[in-house]
Every structure is written in C-alpha cells, then in structure tokens.
UniProtKB/Swiss-Prot annotation:
Species this chain originates from: Jannaschia sp. (strain CCS1)
Coiled coil feature spans: none
Compartments, as annotated in UniProt: Cytoplasm
Protein name: Probable transcriptional regulatory protein Jann_3380
Family label: Belongs to the TACO1 family.
Protein keywords: Cytoplasm, DNA-binding, Transcription, Transcription regulation
Length: 255
C-alpha cells in the first residue's frame, strides 16, 4: 500500500501544479535566472542551469520564457535573490521543508511563519526537521520507457542508487519509474539514463523522507491546505513533507 500511497501523492501534486501553471512558470523562470547568474549562461557548461531548463521544459514552459529568463541574468538588471530553507511541522507532526528564493528575507520569513500558524503548523529552526530527509537526485520515466528490469539495469549502469516502479493498477498515467541517485551525481546519472532510455519526464534535486507519517482524511486535508497555502506564495519554490496516505484517503481528497 505504501508504494501506491507515494504515487497517489505524486499524482495529487501534479494535479495541483496544473492548476498553478502560471505560478509554476514564474517559479521555473526564477530558478533559471538564478542558475544562469551564478554560473555560465550556457546550459551545456552549467549543470544547475541545464537541470533547471530541462525541468522547465518538462512542465511545458515556453521556449521564449526560458530564453528571457537566461537573458535577464546576463543583462545585469535582474534582482538578487537569496535562497533560504525553512523547516517546520504540519498537522499531526508531519515534517515540512520549504525552499524559497526571495529579494526580501523579512517579508518571506513573516509570510511563511504566518502560513504555518494559520494552517495548524508551526515554523521551527533550520535543522529542526532536515535530519528526517536526504538530499537526492530524482529522475522519473513513464512506464512506456521499459519494464522494471530494463529500468533497473539502466539505472545500475548509470550509477543510480535505487529504483521504484509502480504499475499504476493498469493505468499507465498513474504509474511510472522513479530513479534515485546521490545529489552530486544527478547530472551524470541523468545524462547516462537519457542515452539509454531517452528523455526523462522529470530530473531534479529533491528532499527524500527517511521516515513517513501516515495520515487519515482529516489530517491529510489540513496538511494539503498548508502545502497549498505555502505554494501560493511567490517566494516559495518547493514544499516537501514526509507523509503518506492510503489510496482510500487519496480518493476522498480528490472528490
């Protein structure tokens, strides 16, 4: 059941992203600009920028938006953003990591703290929940990329650490392959996988929970409200929480 729960969570987040497409484009553009400003504006010479551009393309960010974001970094008139991670607890003690990019640290800290408080959580100190997660590279492929054995062999050859496959109960849109690797190996692993399996659905750095808390319907609803409220903030780039929910609860959440 745990595997299904994880995949159901992923599908819920994907649905949420579709609703927030304009915000997703804005967040992706900001990451591209920051990555280009910190390194070379050529994605082939800047691993972070390459991954940012790839991830933007995976959620259909238009080419001209990507190009403008890179040009903004090289034009010298872009804002200076600080990357700040906030950590706290949501309903039922679920650990939450919030990654932000901000041009006003005081504003962002105040908004994030207020959002936690208003939605049944509390903001902690940096490091208060980080030990419950590992920083990992994550590459996802659709089921059509190959069977579990094919993906496993490709992942081993590429230097990955782990593979999770979910068949989606016969629905290809609900299943897929998730390949995990060390955060420092993501660029090399993703390149090797693409040479073998073709273009991935997603390639990014994530926080992978080392332990999870299973939630019932009421707590799951509260947590989703917290996550959704955090994601509404333009300064917030990603929100990660160490929860699982059953297929039954997921179905009720989706109603």
């Amino acid at each position: 059941m745990a595997g299904h729960s994880k995949w159901a969570n992923i599908q819920h987040r994907k649905g949420r992203q579709d609703k927030l497409r304009a915000k997703v484009f804005s967040k992706m553009s900001k990451e591209i600009t920051v990555a280009a400003k910190m390194g070379d504006p050529d994605p082939d010479k800047n691993p972070r920028l390459r991954l940012a551009v790839k991830e933007a393309k995976s959620v259909s960010v238009p080419k001209d938006v990507i190009e403008r974001a890179i040009a903004k970094a090289t034009g010298g008139d872009s804002e200076n953003y600080d990357e700040i991670r906030y950590e706290g607890y949501g309903p039922n003690g679920v650990a939450v990591i919030v990654e932000t990019m901000t041009d006003n640290k005081n504003r962002t800290a105040s908004t994030v703290r207020s959002t936690f408080t208003k939605n049944g959580g509390n903001l902690g100190e940096t490091g208060s929940v980080g030990f419950m997660f590992d920083r990992k590279g994550q590459v996802t492929y659709p089921l059509s990329a190959g069977d579990a054995d094919t993906i496993m062999m490709a992942a081993i050859e590429a230097g990955a650490e782990d593979v999770e496959t979910n068949e989606g109960d016969g629905d290809e849109d609900l299943g897929g392959h998730v390949i995990w690797c060390a955060d420092t190996d993501l660029n090399d692993v993703s390149n090797a996988l693409e040479a073998d399996l073709g273009e991935s659905e997603s390639t990014k750095l994530v926080w992978r929970p080392t332990t999870t808390t299973e939630l019932g319907l009421e707590d799951a609803q509260k947590l989703m409200r917290l996550i959704d409220a955090l994601e509404e903030d333009d300064d917030v780039q990603t929100v990660t929480a160490n929860f699982e929910i059953s297929d039954e609860v997921m179905a009720q959440l989706s109603e």
